[in-house]
């Protein structure tokens, strides 16, 4: 247990020191364009085409670069953390394919054919996706995902102070 605590503290300090490594890189101009387009989308009868355009033109390539830096090219099963760098709130999740899951989180924040919408998606949409870091906490096989997700939600208390609604493992 103590080793896990020390490992998590070291990882947290490294994340703060190397925050840009774990973020989607967008220029200020791109961020401003996205904000304008999302405001405009709210006035449109059919928002999906514009939101899909924002994904494909502004996020797809930078997302691929970020995911490649963090995960490499292989399909990764494990536990991940999404952190709001403005307020420090976090979300802990699990997936048998983390890259695809992260992509789905971003699309949900953009309100594109979304998975179940959640507090982390609302925050990403309001604060700007570029203000969130994506981190792989642990690789683990499918049969260990629930157990390890519960561990990290309890460790970070993200169901109390973050975006998780439950203690996880479902």
Predicted region positions:
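N-terminal mitochondrial targeting presequence
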Residues: 1-6
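Structure-specific nucleic-acid interaction/processing domains
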Residues: 11-15, 21-44, 49-170
């Amino acid at each position: 247990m103590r080793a896990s605590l020390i490992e998590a503290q070291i990882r947290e300090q490294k994340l703060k020191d190397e925050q840009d490594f774990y973020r989607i890189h967008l220029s200020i101009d791109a961020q401003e364009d996205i904000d304008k387009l999302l405001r405009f989308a709210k006035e449109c009868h059919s928002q999906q085409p514009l939101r899909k355009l924002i994904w494909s033109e502004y996020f797809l390539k930078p997302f691929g670069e970020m995911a490649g830096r963090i995960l490499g090219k292989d399909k990764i099963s494990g536990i991940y953390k999404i952190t709001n760098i403005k307020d420090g709130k976090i979300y802990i999740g699990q997936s048998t394919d983390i890259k695809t899951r992260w992509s789905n989180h971003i699309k949900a924040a953009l309100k594109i054919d979304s998975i179940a919408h959640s507090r982390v998606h609302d925050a990403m949409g309001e604060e700007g996706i570029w203000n969130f870091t994506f981190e792989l906490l642990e690789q683990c096989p499918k049969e260990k995902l629930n157990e390890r997700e519960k561990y990290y939600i309890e460790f970070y208390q993200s169901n109390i102070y973050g975006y998780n609604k439950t203690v996880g493992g479902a």
